[in-house]
């Protein structure tokens, strides 16, 4: 159960006690089973003793074998085994007390000698089992909780107690840092524990001894400069012994036993935390600097005073400080290898060093954005040949990161980055004094020199380098300011390169119009209309068209959006003598196009004018013949140009603005104030008069040449196959049920109380040899033909001979009016 406590205590003794307890429990259970089988049939105390001893002995034996043979960390029984180890010995003890109490109160009658041996053996095993189990249980409660389960909780409590004690002793404060310490967190260890910083303590001692020995000398402010921030002395973080706790705090000891019943997940978590705390601190100290690699600690930002003190100390020949420099691990990137001689190494040579810290530092410097550095300081990954590297090695001159104090000629403070095997910074050589003034006046900005320019290269190819810089600068990579046109479109005599002026194209217009609209001839305009991409462009073109001048733009928009001007729409479209388009069409689309497309109102007319127009208008026989005959001589009549381009624009403009529903105010009944039913639908219009849709169909087909051509090409095939496609046309039309009713649906009633509407008299179509009356203007309609859509369908069926014109409605049901499809 308690593997960690067993390893920390007397492992051999504890395992012996555990093994003996397991064997005694199993033996006690076996003797109790023998007594139950032979002599005591039904004794409850013995049954409970058998169960408790076997349940306790078998898992204990398994745990012992696991700890001795297998790896203890690979096998864990867990929470249930802890409960058994604690509860089963108590159950066994209770049953043993009850067993001895019953034996003393009523002695057991011995039946045979073997019976006596069983009883004696059972009594002895019970006593020894209770004794050994008590010892093992004591080990569990003492060592197990204190060392294993309570270890992590004790560590947490002691750490918290240490923090509280230090806070009470030193007082609460907010520690402040220098700006250099925030950038180099390694220096924080100077004020930390002396045990972990034995190699760095020489810095503080050197500062104090130098100020004491040289008291009579005048010390510069750089050498003896101290921080202006008050530093609070902090005690060591790691303590060797735990503080004493009050003796009366017994409640904390009771909390330890709660961890005895933890499950396997909690035990695994505590084992991991305990193993993590046992990692030796020596290995961690060797890689102390790796945790600061991702920060700015790789870039030195130490104050000038600290660096100058180190330089002067090295000048005076004080080697004791460097002797005590830590040999393992870097405390700071500056305090390391102070007495090494200056070595100039190229970046190519620095890659041969196998130090992991230097590799990490080099990667950290490489992560700096190269856009923030000048060209001579940018890190390049180009490989340098050995000959070129040896040739340029003498020409490099290291640049110190921080300016140093002027000293004698025999002393030189090495570069900080060179000392720590970092990237060298080559210095760009200065230009000779004779041309320095002229060069600075001509090139005031940054000079884009090559990445690596040595002194020897500069002496050899000085003119070539400067020429390359001038050519790169003369090439303008950006367009001049506010230049929207190319140089070829501009007049060189009127504009200069540095002139800040807006130059617009001569043919610029907004919105954009294609050049084809301006240069198209009259013949091309009659054959094809150029369509714009969207409604907004169409609206702009319509409102700014110079050909439309007879009306105001606001009036045009208002009249186009008006959906109730049926009279003006019909009058504008009615007198046009246009042939009907022969292909199938949608009457609903025709009416919508008529209403919304050509709704330009010039003069308002009354309903009487509309009724007079209906009465006097008719179509001749030639129009019907053109519909039924597919002669090629009549093809060009459908593709005739518009008589008025203004109406075409108005129609397309209104069609793009909206598509409204049909507001049918026409009625097949005559207006009569006496008949309330007919008057509600009639509105005073004449009966049996249809609207001529020929002009609307012509507008729909003629504004698109592709549509007109395709329609004319299909005319012959459609007319020839008219008889075979009557069934399909009948199925496609939505109002077919109005013309194909059953026998009992010859009449319709509005409701149960209204009188049945009588079917009208049959209207015979009068025809002559030269002229036949139009089926749409002078024919009679049944009562089921209610709307304009139904009238148009009725006319089509009449023209196609699908409805017998001579038959009357009263002679039979409506089913007889329709000739059967062949």
Swiss-Prot record:
A single GO BP: mitotic recombination
Species this protein is from: Saccharomyces cerevisiae (strain ATCC 204508 / S288c)
Membrane topology, as annotated: Multi-pass membrane protein
Entry GO terms, CC: cell periphery; cellular bud; fungal-type vacuole; membrane
Parts of the chain on the Cytoplasmic side: 1-13, 66-76, 142-822
Compositionally biased residues, Low complexity: 761-776
Main location: membrane
Membrane side Extracellular: residue ranges: 35-44, 98-120
Annotated localization: Membrane
Name used for this protein in its record: Uncharacterized protein IRC8
Annotated segments matching region Disordered: 271-290, 698-728, 751-783
Sequence ranges of Polar residues compositional bias: 698-712
Post-translational modification Phosphoserine, affected residues: 690
The keyword Phosphoprotein is annotated on this UniProt entry: yes
Alphabetized UniProt keyword annotations: Membrane, Phosphoprotein, Transmembrane, Transmembrane helix
Transmembrane segments: 14-34, 45-65, 77-97, 121-141
Transmembrane helix listed as a keyword: yes
């Amino acid at each position: 159960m308690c593997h960690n406590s067993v390893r920390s205590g007397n492992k051999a003794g504890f395992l012996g006690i555990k093994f003996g307890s397991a064997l005694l429990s199993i033996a006690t259970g076996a003797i109790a089973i023998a007594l139950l089988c032979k002599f005591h049939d039904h004794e409850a105390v013995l049954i409970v003793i058998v169960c408790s001893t076997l349940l306790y002995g078998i898992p204990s034996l398994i745990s012992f074998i696991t700890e001795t043979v297998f790896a203890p960390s690979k096998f864990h029984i867990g929470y249930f085994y802890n409960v058994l180890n604690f509860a089963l010995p108590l159950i066994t003890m209770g049953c043993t007390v009850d067993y001895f109490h019953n034996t003393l109160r009523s002695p057991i009658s011995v039946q045979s000698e073997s019976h006596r041996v069983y009883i004696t053996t059972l009594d002895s095993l019970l006593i020894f089992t209770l004794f050994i189990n008590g010892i093992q249980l004591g080990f569990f409660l003492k060592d197990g909780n204190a060392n294993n389960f309570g270890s992590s909780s004790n560590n947490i409590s002691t750490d918290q107690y240490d923090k509280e004690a230090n806070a009470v002793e030193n007082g609460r404060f907010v520690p402040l840092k220098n700006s250099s310490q925030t950038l180099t967190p390694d220096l924080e260890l100077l004020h930390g524990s002396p045990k972990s910083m034995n190699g760095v303590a020489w810095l503080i001692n050197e500062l104090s001894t130098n100020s004491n020995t040289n008291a009579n000398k005048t010390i510069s402010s750089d050498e003896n400069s101290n921080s202006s921030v008050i530093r609070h002395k902090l005690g060591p973080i790691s303590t060797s012994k735990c503080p004493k706790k009050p003796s009366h705090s017994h409640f904390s000891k009771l909390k330890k036993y709660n961890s005895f019943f933890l499950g396997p997940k909690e035990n695994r978590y505590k084992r991991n935390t305990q193993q993590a705390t046992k990692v030796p601190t020596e290995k961690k100290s060797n890689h102390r600097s790796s945790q600061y690699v991702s920060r700015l600690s790789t870039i030195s930002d130490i104050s000038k005073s600290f660096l100058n003190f180190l330089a002067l100390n090295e000048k005076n020949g004080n080697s004791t400080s460097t002797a005590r420099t830590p040999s393992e691990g870097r405390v700071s990137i500056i305090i390391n290898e102070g007495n090494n001689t200056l070595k100039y190494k190229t970046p190519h040579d620095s890659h041969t060093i196998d130090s992991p810290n230097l590799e990490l530092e080099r990667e950290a410097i490489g992560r700096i954005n190269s856009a923030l550095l000048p060209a001579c300081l940018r890190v390049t990954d180009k490989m340098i040949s050995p000959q070129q590297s040896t040739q340029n090695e003498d020409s490099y001159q290291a640049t110190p990161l921080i300016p140093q104090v002027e000293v004698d000629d025999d002393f030189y403070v090495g570069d900080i980055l060179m000392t720590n095997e970092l990237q060298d910074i080559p210095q760009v050589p200065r230009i000779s004094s004779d041309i320095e003034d002229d060069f600075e006046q001509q090139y005031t900005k940054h000079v884009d020199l090559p990445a690596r320019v040595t002194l020897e290269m500069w002496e050899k190819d000085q003119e070539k380098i400067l020429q390359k810089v001038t050519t790169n600068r003369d090439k303008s990579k950006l367009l001049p300011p506010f230049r929207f046109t190319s140089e070829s479109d501009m007049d060189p005599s009127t504009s200069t390169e540095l002139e800040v002026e807006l130059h617009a194209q001569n043919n610029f217009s907004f919105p954009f119009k294609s050049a084809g609209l301006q240069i198209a001839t009259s013949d091309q305009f009659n054959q094809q209309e150029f369509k714009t991409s969207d409604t907004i462009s169409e609206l702009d073109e319509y409102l700014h068209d110079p050909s439309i001048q007879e009306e105001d733009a606001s009036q045009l928009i208002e009249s186009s959006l008006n959906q109730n001007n049926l009279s003006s729409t019909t009058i504008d479209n009615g007198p046009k003598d246009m042939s009907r388009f022969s292909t199938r069409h949608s009457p609903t689309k025709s009416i919508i196009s008529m209403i919304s497309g050509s709704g330009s109102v010039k003069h308002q007319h009354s309903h009487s004018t509309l009724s007079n127009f209906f009465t006097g208008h008719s179509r001749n026989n030639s129009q019907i013949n053109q519909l039924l005959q597919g002669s090629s001589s009549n093809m060009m009549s459908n593709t005739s140009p518009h008589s008025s381009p203004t109406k075409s624009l108005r129609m397309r403009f209104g069609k793009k603005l909206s598509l409204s529903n049909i507001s049918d105010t026409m009625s097949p009944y005559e207006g009569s104030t006496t008949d309330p039913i007919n008057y509600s639908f009639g509105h005073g219009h004449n009966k049996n008069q249809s609207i001529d849709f020929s002009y609307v169909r012509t507008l729909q087909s003629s504004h698109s040449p592709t549509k007109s051509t395709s329609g004319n090409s299909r005319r012959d095939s459609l007319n020839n196959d008219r008889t075979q496609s009557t069934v399909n046309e009948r199925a496609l039309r939505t109002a077919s049920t109005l013309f194909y009713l059953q026998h009992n649906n010859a009449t319709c009633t509005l409701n149960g109380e209204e009188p049945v509407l009588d079917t009208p008299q049959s209207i015979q179509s009068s025809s002559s040899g030269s002229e036949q009356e139009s089926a749409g203007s002078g024919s009679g309609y049944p009562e089921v033909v209610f709307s304009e859509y139904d009238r148009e369908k009725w006319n089509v069926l009449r023209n196609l001979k699908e409805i017998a014109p001579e038959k009357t409605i009263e002679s039979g049901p409506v089913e007889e009016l329709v000739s059967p499809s062949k």
